[in-house]
């Protein structure tokens, strides 16, 4: 119990600063929306349209660049801190490349996009130039996120917490100046909110650069005094980051698409959806922060080849996430009417929102399973399959189920919430299976194969991979057994020689091999036992 408590304390020490930073970032969006709303309805509408178009892309870009976290954490675990600057520079190069693409997309497609939206002229003007200011936001974030990955892993998550706490204050000050035209500045309305956001992130970038430069532990001067890159670092960054970024984009795209289908149920249903979705997004910061903390801790443990510690952090993560979900879900259900009233004075909208909030409580419970697992898998640099499973869960499960319930039942707008619950549940189930698969593979244990599953479903008592050994053991095919036994003996002798050399060597590169080779020898021993007639459960279910 002491170890569990200690691991939970360690997780919380990393997670809480991340949570505070997440809330501070959300505060910037809240301040923009609130202050733009006081400038006028057109300003609020323009900012809402611009933010609705931009923030799914921004979240995807951040998801891509946050891939630096597991890469750097594993380097720290392996005590290879001298390689950290290469990862930071790789992230910056990738981020700047994304910024160039975003800028080009704005230049060439903004007119077509505005025409397709068919907005009122005043709203279109604000949305167009609000999105222009977001070009600057992407530029600053492209350079800032790799530095945040560095401070979170090589330093402390409290660094980014302290810096992000300044964001709402700085943003509020510049909103006051540029939205309303105080201090001799022009009154730009909603466009001023975008300009204030750009200045805020530029300010944060400067702070991160100063912190990194002043810290010897963060290899700050090495980062900025050299421009050298390594192709393998960029490739690995993309391999881990692209699936993460795409998964965020696909998930947010689905939620945006559901709004389109809800439109036919009226303004009240749409407003209620926005209320429930906004509150659920705020609560979602808890499992997301837990997930980000798990990525750092598990990647560091894996880099140090301490899988036992990684498993303890995994258990601590589930305890924290589930405890948090039980509290927030209970709060959501019990106080759903009050929550709706905070967002609106319209009793009808608040009533519908309260009903939707019950469904969002289901999200919270399933997210407490799937989201931490995503962080664990990121720590293991396993993101590609997770992305595929997420797409299957949401676009192959959630969306079809929502449409089916909408067209074949009388549930109305509730159909889409039930579909979302179904999708999140599918995501949680698939993530559990993926984690179990990856863990068995890392442990050197036999992993289930598609052919083996088919054999099991068809009623066969043995998996295809075990049939040949089982047949040899059962029928005593002496010649074949002797050939395999000779091969086993030869390989065992070679492995013993290699193991002896590894023990005598002090070269760090052999540390991981030293863990893998005994596993392989254990598997060979099982094969030997199977051949001579003592089949093990690993081969004969």
Pin down the residues of each PLM region:
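Short alpha-helical transmembrane segments in multi-pass integral membrane proteins
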Residues: 1-18, 72-139, 185-242, 298-363, ...
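Signature of the first transmembrane helix
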Residues: 9-69, 73, 242-262
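Transmembrane helical elements of multi-pass membrane transporters/channels
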Residues: 13-29, 133, 167, 200-204, ...
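Helix-terminus/linker motif at the lipid-water interface of multi-pass membrane proteins
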Residues: 23, 27-45, 114-121, 177-188, ...
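Interfacial/gating helices of multi-pass transporter permease domains
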Residues: 36-55, 87, 122-126, 190-191, ...
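Small-residue-rich hydrophobic transmembrane alpha-helices
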Residues: 44-104, 141-160, 259, 270-336, ...
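Short runs within selected transmembrane alpha-helices of multi-pass transporters and secretion channels
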Residues: 65, 134-152, 160-171, 193-208, ...
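Long, low-complexity or tandemly repetitive, helically biased scaffold regions used
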Residues: 470-476, 480, 503-541
């Amino acid at each position: 119990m002491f170890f569990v408590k200690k691991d939970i304390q360690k997780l919380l020490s990393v997670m809480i600063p991340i949570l505070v930073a997440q809330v501070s970032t959300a505060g910037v969006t809240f301040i923009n929306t609130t202050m733009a709303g006081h400038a006028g309805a057109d300003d609020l509408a323009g900012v809402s349209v611009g933010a609705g178009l931009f923030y799914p892309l921004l979240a995807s870009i951040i998801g891509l660049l946050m891939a630096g976290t597991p890469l750097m954490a594993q380097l720290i675990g392996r005590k290879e801190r001298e390689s950290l600057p290469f990862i930071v520079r790789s992230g910056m190069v990738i981020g700047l490349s994304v910024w160039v693409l975003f800028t080009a997309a704005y230049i060439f497609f903004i007119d077509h996009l505005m025409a397709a939206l068919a907005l009122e002229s005043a709203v279109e003007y604000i949305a167009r130039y609000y999105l222009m200011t977001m070009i600057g936001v992407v530029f600053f974030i492209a350079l800032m996120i790799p530095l945040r990955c560095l401070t979170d892993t090589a330093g402390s998550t409290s660094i980014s917490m302290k810096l992000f706490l300044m964001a709402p204050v700085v943003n509020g000050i510049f909103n006051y100046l540029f939205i309303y035209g105080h201090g001799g500045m022009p009154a730009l309305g909603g466009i001023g909110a975008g300009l204030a956001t750009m200045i805020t992130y530029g300010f944060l970038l400067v702070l991160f650069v100063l912190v990194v430069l002043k810290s010897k532990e963060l290899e700050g001067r090495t980062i900025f005094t050299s421009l050298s890159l390594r192709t393998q670092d960029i490739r690995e960054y993309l391999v881990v980051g692209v699936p993460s970024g795409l998964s965020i984009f696909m998930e947010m795209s689905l939620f945006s698409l559901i709004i389109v289908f809800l439109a036919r149920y009226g303004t009240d249903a749409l407003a209620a959806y926005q209320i429930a979705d906004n509150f659920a997004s705020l609560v979602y910061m808890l499992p997301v922060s837990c997930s980000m903390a798990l990525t750092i801790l598990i990647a560091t443990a894996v880099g140090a080849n301490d899988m036992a510690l990684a498993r303890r952090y995994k258990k601590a993560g589930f305890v924290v996430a589930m405890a948090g979900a039980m509290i927030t879900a209970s709060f959501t259900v019990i106080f759903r009417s009050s929550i709706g009233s905070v967002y609106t004075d319209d009793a009808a909208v608040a009533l519908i929102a309260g009903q939707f909030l019950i469904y969002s409580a289901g999200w919270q419970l399933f997210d407490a399973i799937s989201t931490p697992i995503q962080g664990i898998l990121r720590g293991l640099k396993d993101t590609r399959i997770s992305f595929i499973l997420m797409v299957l869960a949401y676009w192959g499960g959630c969306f079809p189920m929502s449409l089916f319930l909408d067209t074949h039942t009388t549930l109305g707008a509730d159909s889409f919430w039930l579909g979302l619950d179904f999708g999140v549940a599918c995501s949680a189930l698939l993530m559990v299976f993926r984690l179990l698969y990856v863990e068995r593979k890392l442990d050197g244990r036999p992993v289930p194969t598609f052919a083996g599953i088919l054999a099991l479903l068809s009623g066969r008592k043995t998996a295809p991979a075990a049939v040949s050994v089982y047949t040899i053991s059962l029928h005593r095919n002496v010649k074949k057994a002797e050939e395999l036994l000779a091969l086993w003996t030869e390989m065992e002798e070679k492995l013993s020689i290699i193991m002896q050399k590894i023990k005598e060597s002090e070269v760090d590169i052999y540390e991981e091999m030293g863990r893998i080779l005994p596993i392989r020898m254990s598997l060979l021993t099982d094969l030997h036992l199977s051949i001579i007639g003592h089949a093990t459960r690993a081969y004969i279910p």
